Amino acid sequence: MRVRVLILSLLSVLIPAALAAQSSERPRVRDVGVVVGVMPTGEHNAITDVAGVRVGHTTVSDGASIQTGVTAILPHPGNAYMSRVPAAIHVGNGYGKLLGVTQVRELGELETPILLTCTLCVWKAADAMVEWMLEQRGMEQVRSLNALVGETNDGGLNDIRSRPIEPHHVVAALESATDGPVEEGVVGAGAGTVAFGWKGGIGTSSRVLPQSLGGYTVGVLVQSNFGGILQIAGAPVGVELGQYAFAQQVGRDEDYDPQADVQEWGSIMMVVATDAPLSDRNLERLARRAVMGLSRTGSYASNGSGDYVIAFSTANGVRRSTTGGPHTYDDLSNGNMSGLFEATIEATEESIYNSLFKAVSVTSNGRTVDALPLEETLEILRRYGAIR
């Protein structure tokens, strides 16, 4: 038994490392000349371009039937409970299990980092994060904590019924979180996801507004696991590759393979961060725009898709104190929101493309899901003028 545990532990290290090495060889969408929108990106073109935001991953894979993980997004380097950031949640389609949603909507703030994982591990991940938070200095008297945990269902590539996420996986994601470049593709909560019938995963992007619009940064991170009719910068990639939703029903060619009809169930978690001083009300408005970016990629928010957006602001002037009494906060006016809306749409769209471009093919749980074929995709993008 001890030998088996040691082998599984070794595989859990070697397999994610091998997948990460393959992913590093694949380009991001901007690397091949696809420029989404008009706003410039931040230094890393990642959610971590918003100062203070950190991301950590734990990938859990045994090479046989387990293919899942945890992704942690920390809003700032301090204690998320003691120094709360304003936040909002928008639900595009509510077929999902986002834990902690009602209190965020009621109070408009985060009390914990944000975790993403697989559907049946939401509660295990939340429990582990609560234990981790309660052990932090200054938390000795805390008796209520609103853990915010999102999910998508990776039950095709992952034996989800085994609920493989353990406390040490969650702690590792939280404690390994860093700023700088963010690993994308088959990693963390994106290890077992599928998007548009190809391997999905984690993707991220950012936008920086010009000084005339405030100079603020918006960053987005997604966990893509949904269906639809893939478009990239307007090019009908899914249709051209013959793999898209409703292909069997409305296909133009009698030779279409029924297996190419992309299943409509699935979900996406979208996390939006900004350093603009926004109230939770305007953060909710910002979150709605992420769904517009999602729709640009070919999603139609199917019946079985859980499409959720969590948005928060890291600006010092909007931090919420745990002490009583009146407080004064900065609040960007409604009239200054439009540039942030555009930035959110663009960064969400590009994040989804990056999740597909960086993902590699995976075989697990008796199933193989191929990565988006890059050469064929690039040829389609050139033909439709999507590459600049």
Label each region the model flagged.
Residues 1-4:
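Positively charged n-region of N-terminal signal peptides that target proteins for export
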Residues 22-388:
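Alpha/propeptide regions of enzymes that mature by internal proteolysis
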Residues 7-17:
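Bacterial N-terminal signal peptides
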